[in-house]
Structures are given as structure tokens and as C-alpha cells.
Amino acid sequence: MFPKSMSIAEFDPEIKAAIEAEEVRQEEHIELIASENYASPRVMEAQGSVLTNKYAEGYPGKRYYGGCENVDVVEQLAIDRACELFGADWANVQPHSGSQANGAVYMAMLKAGDTVLGMSLDAGGHLTHGAKPNFSGKTYNAVQYGLDNETGLIDYDQVASLAREHKPKMIVAGFSAYSQIVDWQRFRDIADEVGAILLVDMAHVAGLVAAGVYPSPVGIADITTTTTHKTLGGPRGGLIMGKASEEIQKKINSAVFPGGQGGPLEHVIAAKAICFKEAMQDDFKGYQQQVVKNAQAMAGVFIERGFDVVSNGTENHLFLLSLIKQDITGKDADAALGRANITVNKNAVPNDPRSPFVTSGLRIGSPSITRRGFDEADAKALAGWICDILENMGDEGVIEQVKGKVKEICARLPVYER
């Protein structure tokens, strides 16, 4: 029915052209968006496999459809590997995204109107940690904690004070733009004091945690969620894990299916299983160590050049660059760097006077550049080029000079060998 010779190029040249253009963009641009990474050809092969054809509502051994014997093997491998990799007692690999993983936890553990304590968006939290436009801020009574104005670090005293005042049913720890080590045990102690459930969203640092480069929350939190891309470098998807608790596991599984999703994406789950196996290889720890070294090298250059790095450095894969002092908007900086083939994302910074669509900062991450082979010297050079552009906003000559250097280093360090 489907000959092997069938191709996208012949049938849909418009889509093929867009794919090829994106391949060129990824090869010729430097990727500094902290939530992005490059998936291996093995991961992409799984996502393009015949597993995409199979509907498999339910869980391994307990499906609502027949013919699931092979996808049962795939999903169980993913579950077992996730538990082994992170030291969890149970895992649900079906969430389609990190946001849906978090949504399932909310649905499983809370009722509408319950109080949730999470990090505010402008302090580095995620939409699903109680932001007003998100379901977590609309369905639940969201109380937000932030950073210490002097240190740029999480204000644990504020967290404890808010917890005592508002008695949240659940406390959410984790972030999308925080560059330091989180004291998971401090959150545990606060949660225990007020009788709250502790959810940790480690989406950004899961790869670092898997490699032992960043402290693990899995044995501390009641429930841990993550994505499988970002620092893990796998397919786009979500994962929920926890300590031994049959009650919590059952609630979570029911909230994922049938509560929030129907059929799982078994081709993506296969890719997750491969990603977990990749993270168990000897070279993965070296990669994650280099991710941190490269982020620290870049942050150091910005500080030396007089830019403000929130919390004055980084202990993970990302950092926030505040441009308030330079009176440059994140939107303008993002656009200028984009013209030099450097991809970043504008980001709100603590006490940002500008709107979330404009912002006064940039979020910079090192997973992608490290994946393609950047070392500290390359990272420092790159940070210097970014400084050159930011110090000469509007100078297209500087942008063109940097763009040439970017293309040279990208050619030297390709993402996918041809």
C-alpha cells in the first residue's frame, strides 16, 4: 500500500521546503534558548516509526484496545528506565508535555479553589506554577513567592511565611528561569510544617539531575514532574514520578488517563525510553558537566563586561541577563541577536518595569551549544559577541561581523553530520 519510495518532497513540496529550511536554520544558527536541545537521530527515528499508528488507551497489561503487546513492551521499558535513571518508585510516561504532567498532578491532588503556593513568573517560575493566565492560576487559589531583592535567590523565609499564612494544599518548587541550586529539603520541611503536598517541577534540570550534577528532588518530593527534552535532550514530552505511595500513584494514573488524555503517543514514549537509555551512558555525565561549565563561562563574560546577571552567576544550565541598566528591551535584544544568527528568548527579570511581551531581559541556556561541541573557550567567545551587539545596538555592521563568526563556528561544529 505504501511503497518505500514515497516521500514528502514529491507529495508536499511546501512542507518539505519548510523542513529543509529549518534544518538549515538549526545548523547555521546558535541556539541559546534554555528549554531547547537537539534530539539524537535515534530519538527521531522512534518518533517516525510505525508505533505512531497504534492506539493504546490504558496502561501496560490493562489496555482498552487489542494488539497492544508490542507497545506494552515499549511503555514498560520507558517506565522501568525512568525509575532506574531517577531513583523513583513509580513513573507515568504518558503525559504529552510538562504542562500536562503538572495539570495531571493538580487534577489528582487538588480540588478547584484549593490554595497552591508556587514561584511567580517574573521571579523565574512557570505558567503552571500559579500564573494568572494559566489553568493553575484560574482554577486554584494561587499564592506566589519570589526572590530576595538583595541576593536574587529564592526567599525561603518568604516561602515559609506565606505557607503559614495561607496553608496551601500544595507547594510547587521548581522553575523555568532560575540559575541557582534549589534547596529541595527546605521546601520539604516547609510543606511538612503546614501539611502540604510537595510537587517539584524539575523540567529544566532533569538532565543535570540524571547525571548527578544537580541535587535530585525525587526522593524528597511527594511527586516530581519533568519534560523529556530540555537538558535531557529527548523528545518533547512529559513525565511524572514519585516515591512509593500506591494511593498517589493511582490518583496520578487516573488523572493522566482518562482524566486529561486519551490514547498515549507510543512513538513518543519509545523515544522517551531511548532518551532515558542515552542518559545512562558514560558520556552523558561529561555532557551535563560541560553544560554547567559553559553556562558559567558565559555568565562570567557578561559580568566582566558590566552586564547584570540575576543572582550574579549560575549553578545550572541557564541564567538571566538583565538589561534594565542598559535601557534595552528584551524584545529588541532578541531581535538584534536573531539577525546575527543567535537565537535567545526575551524574558522578564525580577522587578521588571516592562510588559511580559517586551521585558527587560534575556534568558540564556547552554544545553544546545554544548550538545554540538562548544567548550568554555567557545562559550566565552560567543558571550563576547553577544556583548558586542548589545553594546552597539542598531549597528548592523557589528551584527554582520558577528553573524560571520557564528556561521564559521557552526560549520566547525555541526549538529548532525551529513
UniProtKB/Swiss-Prot annotation:
Positions bearing N6-(pyridoxal phosphate)lysine: K230
GO cellular component: cytosol
EC number: 2.1.2.1
Needed cofactors: pyridoxal 5'-phosphate
Biological processes per GO annotation: glycine biosynthetic process from serine; tetrahydrofolate interconversion
Reaction(s) catalysed by this chain's protein: (6R)-5,10-methylene-5,6,7,8-tetrahydrofolate + glycine + H2O = (6S)-5,6,7,8-tetrahydrofolate + L-serine
Metabolic or biological pathway: One-carbon metabolism; tetrahydrofolate interconversion; Amino-acid biosynthesis; glycine biosynthesis; glycine from L-serine: step 1/1
Compartment annotation: Cytoplasm
Site (Plays an important role in substrate specificity): H229
Subunit relationships: Homodimer.
Function in brief: Catalyzes the reversible interconversion of serine and glycine with tetrahydrofolate (THF) serving as the one-carbon carrier. This reaction serves as the major source of one-carbon groups required for the biosynthesis of purines, thymidylate, methionine, and other important biomolecules. Also exhibits THF-independent aldolase activity toward beta-hydroxyamino acids, producing glycine and aldehydes, via a retro-aldol mechanism.
Family designation: Belongs to the SHMT family.
Designated name of the protein: Serine hydroxymethyltransferase
Species name: Alcanivorax borkumensis (strain ATCC 700651 / DSM 11573 / NCIMB 13689 / SK2)
Organism taxonomic ancestry: Bacteria, Pseudomonadati, Pseudomonadota, Gammaproteobacteria, Oceanospirillales
Record gene name: glyA
